[in-house]
């Protein structure tokens, strides 16, 4: 079955499908989504 293009989760680098029904997209899981949120809150990510 063809689900479309694959991308990598920006946190753990696991491959996920673009068209897959994923509540946590663009992350692969709730854990990766929370890790990303923490990185924003802690100041690791910055907008210039």
Curated annotation (Swiss-Prot):
Alphabetical list of Pfam families matching this protein: YacG
Keyword Metal-binding (UniProt): yes
Organism superkingdom: Bacteria
GO molecular function: DNA topoisomerase type II (double strand cut, ATP-hydrolyzing) inhibitor activity; zinc ion binding
Subunit structure: Interacts with GyrB.
HAMAP family found in the cross-reference section: DNA_gyrase_inhibitor_YacG (MF_00649)
InterPro entries to which the protein is assigned, alphabetical: DNA_gyrase_inhibitor_YacG (IPR005584), Znf_NHR/GATA (IPR013088)
Family designation: Belongs to the DNA gyrase inhibitor YacG family.
Gene Ontology biological process terms from the UniProt entry: regulation of DNA-templated transcription
Keywords, ordered alphabetically: Metal-binding, Zinc
Cofactor: Zn(2+)
Protein's job: Inhibits all the catalytic activities of DNA gyrase by preventing its interaction with DNA. Acts by binding directly to the C-terminal domain of GyrB, which probably disrupts DNA binding by the gyrase.
Residues annotated as binding Zn(2+): 9, 12, 28, 32
Listed Gene3D superfamilies: Erythroid Transcription Factor GATA-1, subunit A
Native organism taxonomy: Bacteria, Pseudomonadati, Pseudomonadota, Gammaproteobacteria, Enterobacterales
Note describing how the cofactor binds: Binds 1 zinc ion.
Protein name: DNA gyrase inhibitor YacG
Gene of this entry: yacG
